[in-house]
Amino acid sequence: MANQTNSGNERVDLAYRRRKNAEEMRHQMIAFVLMILLTLIAFAAVGYEEFSHWFVVPFILLLAAVQVAFQLYYFMHMSHKGHEFPAMFIYGGVAVMLLLVWAFTTVVWW
């Protein structure tokens, strides 16, 4: 009964929507701050002269992958119910892309 959004009482419905919106905004702000932090870490890694490019390039690619996952999960609302079907296509596309990169890398290098 706690998940029911249409109780017939407008005040209860309004309070429920406000609470859900506040919770969603909190998640959005946390994800945004984490992405800004990851971007600053990437800039710091590039700017720090002691790191070689053999470390910096894979590190930045890892940070980029984490940011893409955050954006898909939070900003594209993949964390919400009812978004399983689009999420399946997105994750399937990522799997096909990784398979293609692996296949072409194998063909070119061997």
From Swiss-Prot:
Catalytic activity: 4 Fe(II)-[cytochrome c] + O2 + 8 H(+)(in) = 4 Fe(III)-[cytochrome c] + 2 H2O + 4 H(+)(out)
Membrane topology: Multi-pass membrane protein
Pfam families: COX4_pro (PF03626)
GO cellular component, one term: plasma membrane
Catalytic EC class: translocase
The UniProt record lists the keyword Cell membrane: yes
Family statement: Belongs to the cytochrome c oxidase bacterial subunit 4 family.
Protein name: Cytochrome c oxidase subunit 4B
